[in-house]
């Protein structure tokens, strides 16, 4: 396995997305300098947690009831920061590091360590952390003594100053080596968080909830305002934490069970209470970046063949059928909807896993994790929505995917959702008898070397492996294709000699400005032999 990308500045560029006013303006340019990096085990014990005035007993049900009551009261925005916290700018924030010798839980037998992110700059809403030990809550307080202030900040910031909270936190764990506490999961900004499987580098993010994303209604960014972290004992390999979520339209009580490994699992339970009606509820939202790949790199003068954190949306349907929708960087805002009932999973995947696919020795896109959302319990009917936002820069997250439950959300409603997030280099060969979509390419239609007078677009889809990959070129198989708002002019299917790949080539025509929806799979001998390829082409 290749060594994980160093958790350097590059890996943190989009932990800050919540600072944008809308997910349709996700420009976090210049944020690559934030100090998230693997940490060595601290040498000194951290200060003891400061207890609240009267330590109280904690349970998930207690937090749930508190958030239910909060939903009956008006939403209150956090107050603006004052003093030096309110004056911090980008360069200042880059000059602040958490002191590793102040890591919380370092003086316990826990396998996990807590480190905080500093308040200020884009992060003006204080987050409170609480330690839950033997069922009782103690607030974990932070001061300027917990942070290193470099450059001219060292003269501006006084020592021993209590902070009103933190911006978020990271949980470290010996993920890749037993002697190094690597960053495992980070919560920073609104309800954003991200995690790593073994050998991964940061890429895709998740959120606690998406409210009115890419709708005519104002978008909200719910935020986690408090976290309650159960202290694992005796070398326990799972961390359990709880979060209070607040927003103008909704409150929530969340439970996270985080289990690190080759694939890091996060089991999420979200109990939601609505102050007001919501135009669109986005459950288990994922946020990623797709700039270009082989199918659209002609407009980029770049030595790298691919630049993306994820290259496709995968949906495993209730009946086991797998949909694969390659991602786009469209000319205008695009949405795709996949109606489902109790899907087995959906997620944003990074299927290309070779350095040669990217040739980026700094970003190491081949190490970015895939993430699957696996519903737990009955989710009923709804749809997976994919939103693709035009961008010119890889520093912008422009891909959003989430579940939209069927039905209206009204004031006074309550909902509960449970699901599992799988983070890692997820396998693509399951089930092994089904060919998966190996590559999607696109270009001018017609015959090579001849002018394309018909103005068609050519799509080349490679299906690899499975039973299909073992069939000879004269096997009785066929491509089942469909198109909306366009026309398939020509269609060919052939086996590539010496490879377990079958290639489908489509020439598609459409009117100017049309949004064309394409679908294809391979079938034969009375059964489906491949995943279903889906694609949206906007003829600009």
From Swiss-Prot:
GO terms for cellular component: outer membrane-bounded periplasmic space. InterPro entries: Gal_mutarotase_sf_dom, GH-type_carb-bd, Glucan_biosyn_MdoG/MdoD, Glucan_biosyn_MdoG_C, Ig-like_fold, Ig_E-set, MdoG_OpgG, TAT_signal. It comes from the Bacteria. GO terms for biological process: beta-glucan biosynthetic process. The keyword Signal applies. Its main location: periplasm. It is found in: Periplasm. Residues 1-38 form the signal peptide. Pathway: Glycan metabolism; osmoregulated periplasmic glucan (OPG) biosynthesis. Coiled coil: none annotated. Keywords: Periplasm, Signal. It holds the Pfam family MdoG. GO terms for molecular function: carbohydrate binding; catalytic activity. Belongs to the OpgD/OpgG family. Involved in the biosynthesis of osmoregulated periplasmic glucans (OPGs). HAMAP family: MdoG_OpgG (MF_01069). This is Glucans biosynthesis protein G. It comes from Cereibacter sphaeroides (strain ATCC 17023 / DSM 158 / JCM 6121 / CCUG 31486 / LMG 2827 / NBRC 12203 / NCIMB 8253 / ATH 2.4.1.). The lineage of its organism: Bacteria, Pseudomonadati, Pseudomonadota, Alphaproteobacteria, Rhodobacterales.
